[in-house]
């Protein structure tokens, strides 16, 4: 999954049956298609998983003008937003569901992403949904601050809209 840090919107996702690079690549391509060439000066932050460090993944980021940031340590708090969305998906939105096919998993994840982006408000974005927050310009008043923000000082996420 690819999460927009400003809006908390899931902007790219793909379901796979392994940890092969092809699945994160598909999620990244989904986001790049949405960006339509406007990815320059964005930062892609991830852990140091082999998928995100693969030459193909790194090349796609660089070819689209996206800067690369990776965690320094094995501390999950260094990639807290990714850990949080994975936890929310698994333990809140998909908890207790069983599937008999990959097609069922893909369909359920698609519905869950749609719900998460369009109907689930977040305290971290002033109780807006991610889609509502994505429509904003400027600083969003936050109800709480992340571990990373408390560690490095106040981080302001600004949403710049190209006209």
Regions found by a protein language model. Name each.
Residues 62-66, 88-163:
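C-terminal domain-tail junction helix/linker
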């Amino acid at each position: 999954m690819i999460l927009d840090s400003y809006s908390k919107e899931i902007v790219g996702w793909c379901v796979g049956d392994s940890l092969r690079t092809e699945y994160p690549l598909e999620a990244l391509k989904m986001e790049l298609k949405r960006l339509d060439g406007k990815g320059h000066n964005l930062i892609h932050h991830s852990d140091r998983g082999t998928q995100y460090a693969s030459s193909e993944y790194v090349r796609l980021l660089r070819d689209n003008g996206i800067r690369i940031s990776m965690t320094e340590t094995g501390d999950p708090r260094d990639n807290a937003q990714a850990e949080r969305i994975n936890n929310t998906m698994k333990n809140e939105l998909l908890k207790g569901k069983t599937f008999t096919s990959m097609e069922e998993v893909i369909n359920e994840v698609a519905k869950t992403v749609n719900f998460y982006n369009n109907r689930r408000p977040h305290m971290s974005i002033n109780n807006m949904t991610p889609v509502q927050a994505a429509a904003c310009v400027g600083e969003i008043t936050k109800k709480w601050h992340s571990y990373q923000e408390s560690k490095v000082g106040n981080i302001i996420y600004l949403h710049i809209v190209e006209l």
